[in-house]
From Swiss-Prot:
It catalyses: a flavonol + UDP-alpha-D-glucose = a flavonol 3-O-beta-D-glucoside + UDP + H(+); a 7-O-hydroxy-flavonol + UDP-alpha-D-glucose = a flavonol 7-O-beta-D-glucoside + UDP + H(+). Keywords: Glycosyltransferase, Transferase. Transmembrane segments: none annotated. The gene is UGT89B1. CDD domains: GT1_Gtf-like. Its EC number is 2.4.1.91, 2.4.1.237. UDP-alpha-D-glucose binds at residues 348, 350, 365, 368-370, 373, 389-390. The keyword Transferase applies. This is Flavonol 3-O-glucosyltransferase UGT89B1. Possesses quercetin 3-O-glucosyltransferase, 7-O-glucosyltransferase and 4'-O-glucosyltransferase activities in vitro. Also active in vitro on benzoates and benzoate derivatives. Gene3D superfamilies: Glycogen Phosphorylase B. InterPro entries: UDP_glucos_trans. Belongs to the UDP-glycosyltransferase family. The lineage of its organism: Eukaryota, Viridiplantae, Streptophyta, Embryophyta, Tracheophyta. The active site is at residues 25, 127.
Length: 473
């Protein structure tokens, strides 16, 4: 640690954190920042960049840790983003590329802030949607809120730019022979960002270059752990040409059960409801912060839950606006399942629910945060991937880790209610191989974040490396 010559006190190593404004991206990076601040202690000074309307996501962290401060920059306007919108949660799924492109306009303000700062950051840790931050004149660490295998696939897509043989066939299989286990997916199951790419369009060329900058960044931090994805972490090191890849997961909240937004049911009520149920007898249903089921899917899922006879908690994201193709749960459902079903409209205290002894299975869209939280809880996953990296996550969960069972797949698929009912009933009875594997993986996950565990060692290694960057300036 350097010493300030004026007061003879050690100079802290300054690190800038830049989350991407979407719940599934902000939450894990802010949780990582919390751990970084606690573990780094007096060695680190941390600044977190947010736009004004995203400050509430950061506020709990600012009140919990003293060596973190905010950098609030105005949101850069974009012609296709409504005025006042600064987070992807207020946009349809198609809003991701708009947000990526808009945030690229923070390059000049960031350069100005860095060059004028009396003690500028020696490094930046930014979300993998913000690859352009590699070009700020300081070492940039790519933070992946997704699985290591997803990083492998995204790198291959944006560097090699594979295309379909038959442009009209979305069922065509895309192979990744250079990646361990040679994964393959239908073309409609790979990144929608990649599938939407338009050659020569300036906005899309910016996004392509940004993803390519991830591979060329100084280092990579992944929300995973060696026992779960070691083979993919080693592949990333070979691909990037160095060992500056740190697996610091599972990144889980140190506190807070209701960080994501308003909910129709209090956390205390949810916990009391679960307390009255037997161990491993409740199915938890949640599709994350972005997915709104179609009316037909909602009806099929409600029917499957009703027919199954299982106890369940269903966290429902309802449409922001009236939409004839997307429906709410029909009136009367709550009454028909009263006593064995609890419907939460809005944000659910997912971490607390999954960790409760009564929860035995989790119907999930396979967003990586949800997968990680289920792994830490040791809960059997029932997979229903719909988009983005969810197909990759589902394949990892079911085919490789064997801690899940397929329930359905696809954003528009309407499942058979009777088949869903069978899957639900089977998931909370007996000791399936998948349930046993889930318990074993939970132990490996918890071991990784214990003192001298693989992820704690990687976190310490990351901190030491960042501090060394400050010493060498």
């Amino acid at each position: 640690m350097k010493v300030n010559e004026e007061n003879n006190k050690p100079t802290k190593t300054h690190v800038l954190i830049f989350p991407f404004p979407a719940q599934g991206h902000m939450i894990p990076l802010l949780d990582f920042t919390h751990r970084l601040a606690l573990r780094g202690g007096a060695a680190l000074k941390i600044t977190v960049l947010v736009t004004p309307k995203n400050l509430p996501f950061l506020s709990p962290l600012l009140s919990a840790v003293v060596n973190i401060e905010p950098l609030i920059l105005p949101f850069p306007s974009h012609p296709s983003i409504p005025s006042g919108v600064e987070n992807v949660q207020d946009l349809p799924p198609s809003g991701f590329p708009l947000m990526i492109h808009a945030l690229g306009n923070l390059h000049a303000p960031l350069i100005s802030w860095i060059t004028s700062h009396p003690s500028p950051p020696v490094a930046i840790v930014s979300d993998f949607f913000l690859g352009w931050t590699k070009n700020l004149g300081i070492p940039r660490f790519d933070f992946s809120p997704s699985a290591a295998i997803t990083c492998c696939i995204l790198n291959t897509l944006w560097i090699e730019m594979p295309t379909k043989i038959n442009e009209d066939d979305d069922n065509e299989i895309l192979h990744f022979p250079k990646i361990p286990n040679c994964p393959k997916y239908r073309f409609d199951q790979i990144s929608s960002l990649y599938r939407s790419y338009v050659h020569g369009d300036p906005a899309w060329e910016f996004i392509r270059d940004s993803f390519r900058d991830n591979v060329a960044s100084w280092g990579l931090v992944v929300n995973s752990f060696t026992a779960m994805e070691g083979v993919y972490l080693e592949h990333l090191k070979r691909e990037m040409g160095h060992d500056r890849v740190w697996a610091v997961g599972p990144i889980i909240p140190l506190s807070g059960d209701n960080r994501g937004g308003p909910t129709s049911v209090s956390v205390d009520h949810v916990m009391s409801w679960l307390d009255a149920r037997e161990d491993n007898h409740v199915v938890y249903v949640c599709f994350g912060s972005q997915v709104v089921l179609t009316k037909e899917q909602t009806l099929a899922l409600a029917s499957g839950l009703e027919k199954s006879g299982v106890h369940f908690i269903w966290a429902v994201k309802e449409p922001v606006e009236k939409d004839s193709t997307r429906g709410n749960i029909l009136d009367g459902f709550d009454d028909r399942v009263a006593g064995r079903g609890l419907v939460i409209r809005g944000w659910a205290p997912q971490v607390a629910v999954l960790r409760h002894r009564a929860v035995g299975a989790f119907l999930t869209h396979c967003g990586w945060n949800s997968v990680v939280e289920a792994v830490v809880a040791g809960v059997l996953m029932l997979t229903w991937p719909m988009r983005a990296d969810q197909y990759t996550d589902a394949s990892l969960v079911v085919d490789e880790l064997k801690v899940g069972v397929r329930a359905c797949e696809g954003p528009d698929t309407v499942p058979d209610p009777d088949e869903l009912a069978r899957v639900f009933a089977d998931s909370v009875t007996g000791n399936q191989t998948e349930r046993i594997k889930a318990v074993e993986l939970r132990k490996a996950a918890l071991d990784a974040i214990q003192e001298r565990g693989s992820s704690v060692n990687d976190l310490d290694g990351f901190i030491q490396h960042v501090v060394s960057l400050g010493l060498n300036k």
